[in-house]
Amino acid sequence: MAASTARILNAGGPPAFKIRAVLASMLSPSWGIYSGYELTENTPLRPGSEEYLDSEKYQYRPRDWDAAARDGLGIAPFITDLNRIRKSHLALHWLRNLRFHHVDRPELICFSKRVSGREITAAGASAGSTYGAGNITERPSVMAAPQAGEQGGAFSDTVLVVVNLDPHQAREATVWLDMPELGMGWHEGFTVTDELTGDSFRWGQANYVRLDPASRPAHIFTITRDLA
């Protein structure tokens, strides 16, 4: 999935770039960005154009990446965090485990990806891969511990994402989770930890969320279930 779309990005500033990067990197097992995305280059070739003015399609475009890093320009550290999260969580390596959850405002979107030990074992046996799905060849650097209710010590890995789709202002909503899709009962409580900030919260089926795109365009949560 590609994150770069000039028509969307040329009016949203850095928050729009972060929002698009979260969606592309968390929704799909593979993702890519156009050169210059890290620097939030967003000048269109012409008003409403899908092409960038500073595209390599039209010119040789050298960029001083080191200077940008020194000056704190762009979103390269944010993209590094997204790739770190992708590498750490096996659930993000799969495509068909994507599930959406209800949000009572259209400006926010919520989705999850979950994989259980049984699914990984079955997929690995059928695809000739140790960790399944045919496209997984390396064990992730971080694996979720066995969760309450998992059988035979098998681990599960769940990533829950909430994104503000509006790059211009803070939005708030109630997120209603489909608990069985997360491997839990409807009335179960649990702890979510934001992989971007380290913040933790107690959650259940219905949860209030407020996201300001200027400071926090998204939550990327991992889930810790209460011990049985």
Predicted regions and their residues:
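Carbohydrate-interacting/catalytic domains
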Residues: 3, 9-12, 17-18, 33, ...
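Active-site region of glycoside hydrolase catalytic domains
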Residues: 21-25, 29
